[in-house]
Amino acid sequence: MKERYHLLDALRGFAIYHVIIFHFLYDVYVVYGLNLDWPYQTWVQLWQRNGCGLFVLVSGMVFALGRNTFKRGLQLQILGLIITLATYVFAPSEVIYYGILTFFGSAMWLTLLVKVFLQRIPAILGMLASVVCYVLAKDVAMGVASFFGRKLFEFPEWLYQNCFAILGFHSNTFYSSDYVPLLPHIFLFWFGMYLFAWLRERKLTHLLTGGNYKIFTWPGTHSLEIYILHQPILMGLCYVIFGRTP
């Protein structure tokens, strides 16, 4: 019987709670127009970034388990495409291009493609390199690579076309209500992968078997289904609260 890492399930469940609460408030304040400036507040952006980051990091750790990763990546890519088409048709003002599901599918495939090279890097060095690369790439949307606020160089302007949006480069006309590009998030995904490898090397993975609290582990083990269903349910709830469509 395979060992279950309950702490990973719990962390993923915690992250999905974050997603539900954040999207409910987004629907109330932005979609229903109560406060259109809400998503631009500093604390909201930090909340969104940290919640997304936790999801990505944990997913990188789960990827290291190596369970049906290609098939899982394909499933996520298809679901991401369906969400893009659905929002484009039924909610064009909140259309989603390259959202979190598309990112996970792309991250899995890209990692599989270069896995033979990544595995040659010692886990501790891989974690360190992932952190450095994440910091360097976090301002790619602003056209620069920086290191703790110090600009190192500018990316070529020709990169900033919408055809490269999945990578993190896009024009000023690009919009997506849920946008998780490969840069810088792939490095957080790889950090999670190397973190699990480091724990496994030191025989510390038993630390991940604790935390079996159903309130977190249950949604963690059903995170994909919950993610797909939560937004239609939230929009239905908002319709009941406000008595109208947006």
Locate predicted features.
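Alpha-helical transmembrane segments and their immediate juxtamembrane cytosolic regions
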Residues: 1-246
